[in-house]
């Protein structure tokens, strides 16, 4: 393989995003997240970045490198969960996390001035410590200290070069105002004889311990850097990338998505014996729906990790229904009657995701280990979420994944009260899941007859929900009035008749919204709509819709500057508001793009690869077909688009799309060993 193809794809990336803090979890070790500052710099945010998850904020502590070139905007040519390489004029700054220290390797013109600035910002009185204020002091021999009086997390700013000068915040003259965050900072100035310096901001629960960590971080900086770059190379040697005439923000957008997915995979800990999917980086937890979708997305680059995470999620679950849990085994989705809930077979389509993951690897040993867990999961739903007449139900909106959806009307109380509704998507999902299980049993030489019967039963139940040209949820009083894109599920699950498919094919021109939102701004709902369109023969609509969405979302997260009212670039987000890059007023002003660093926000990668680039694998088939549908704007005669390094069953697939003089597409394929 070409050596460049084994490396991270260098480019002009946004200087915004997150470094991975592998020690961060939510019950056993709240360690915080590491987010860019808007300059060349990173900040710890503890216990997480304040937002929809983890609203309680205690402190932030930032290390920023300020070269003497303010007229040049920084960018990154290396942008991964492990390491950011900032460029600003003639300066290069590599930043990464070394245990409990933010490390910066600075390189610039000899003897040019540069500043290292540390800023500690804290909301006193919320941590439970005896924190009454902050202090800043500078030692004559180099270390700068930022700490709390009387107790609390301390930081040390330390470089391996002598100081040319330093300034720091003066001591408090009186008790600070505890109703507002307080701030202290130290700015150290350097004039580097050879233009190189290592500077760190280390933390600990005392200044002395922080100083010891700072010294170790400097001593180990070179080896830590090598380890980080090796990890990046190991991932990217088998990960897809875009080359050629693709839009710049598409080329980089795929990278941001894949790096977000890398970052939400957490190391083993607590009840999880293998790596696990944290769903999002701020307040990690295991949710089957997000795990299945996230790992399907990650399997386009790292199928081995995806397979490990999915299997471990089922194996280490505290109950067959895979309740939503933290790493210590505590549950965090309890209904009003006290039941610990997990997400359903319909939310993010876990069995569909498992089927595609299996087809991508062909790993029958993995399938043999997975199937008993998958059977227990589906058995649980058949035993605990069906009425005596056979109708399935959700116990609560949380279990459906569709919190407070109008489909559930006044019965929805957030945590329960919707048991009387037979949901279309659940019937269809049970039919699909049982059918897939039957197929997997057949491949393993096991009897799958009971799953074939269950699949037929739920397919028949789904058919009975067809009313007035649409699949409607039902109660004892008859069909409900609410329409929702999730009710297209019979198309995605292949349980709709030809007549029903033909009738619904016309619906894609004017889809109903979802829970007060547009039909494609929440990733799982967008996936349901687009895959249903594909199965209904509306592939052109699916491709055009996916391309428009991908273009908009990737343009936003590739922005070179983070401006007020816009989502942070460089990372995937939970939600894709249709208003585009600005947070709208009213309801959207509260929600915006929601959580930063959310795995399913990277579903744009799947939408691009499956519906635009045309990679069509099938959970019920060995086939991989390629049917690209590029948007009209890309069909410029002579343009060439390359999609490289796609893993498929131990090999890497390269695709080249060339636009002919007539505006058509010529496709070339080649394979190499992984």
Predicted feature locations:
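The feature captures the catalytic groove of carbohydrate-active enzymes
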Residues: 188-194, 198-218, 280-281, 325-349, ...
